[in-house]
């Protein structure tokens, strides 16, 4: 298990907390883009607002998914072919954790995402977080 996942969760929580201030809410982007090169989500942490969208652009040679963790308040599972694009609309504020189920797996015992055996980046599971702040 990598230390990066807990660090990402702490960073996402801090970012979500900061989104509650009036200044941040008025300057938050409504839409975000996540690029998928070489079995990674970049940026790992994205910011949007309720009613906004996150567009995932697969710049990799193989297909990927953007899959919510089991038990998430909002479930999603987008399959994105190589070179494809998919968009996710965010209707509720919160931190949306996701991963690629083709290249990583979720362990409910540890609440962590880990890279699958043979992954391009075994120390960095293919996972990310979207932080959606209340709009307005």
List PLM regions with ranges.
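Beta-strand cores of secreted/periplasmic/IMS beta-sandwich domains, seen most often
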Residues: 43-62, 67, 84-92, 96-98
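Extracellular/periplasmic metallocenter environments
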Residues: 80-136
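N-terminal edge beta-strand
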Residues: 27-50
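Bacterial N-terminal signal peptides that target proteins for export
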Residues: 1-8
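C-terminal motif of bacterial Sec signal peptides marking the signal peptidase cleavage site
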Residues: 15-18
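A mature extracytoplasmic/lumenal domain signature
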Residues: 38-40, 58-60, 70-72, 92, ...
